[in-house]
Amino acid sequence: MTRAPAIDPSERYVLLTTFCRDGSPVATPVWFAPLPDDPDTLAMITDREAGKVKRLRHTSRCTLAPCDVRGRPHGDAVEAEGRVADDPGEVAAATAALAGRYGWQWRLLGFGARLRGRDPAASRAVLLVRPTAPT
């Protein structure tokens, strides 16, 4: 029996909620792509200095919910565990999955970074988030 994914892969955005040290939630809409070798793990990309990177480094607990581009959820949130990918192979797989999923939008994002004098690959962090099994 095949298990349905926690987040519908046809969604364009997911609301990633990370938690501050004091436990307060911070929600952000982000692009995501399932990893080809592990479709339960979702890859996301953000600026290396973003707050969500810092928050995931100190606590892996997060939640995911389908949402629109403005972060308005339209489905239930699921508990998840997230981490910042440091392995070059994981970063390459995540980057390829996101580039394949978002196509011209992905290329435009890189072009915009280069216009601002930034190396897109050096200025971003890859997040890997996996919904936790319901208990």
Model-derived segments and spans:
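Short, basic/aromatic recognition patches
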Residues: 1-15
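Short beta-strand segments
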Residues: 11-48, 54-56, 62-66, 75-79
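Short proline/glycine-enriched turn/loop segments at secondary-structure junctions
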Residues: 116-118
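Short, small/hydrophobic-residue-rich motifs at membrane-helix boundaries and re-entrant hairpins
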Residues: 1-3, 127-132
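Short, structured beta-strand-loop surface elements
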Residues: 49-114, 123-128
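A broad, low-specificity signal for short, low-complexity segments enriched in glycine/proline
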Residues: 1-5, 24-26, 38-45, 86-92
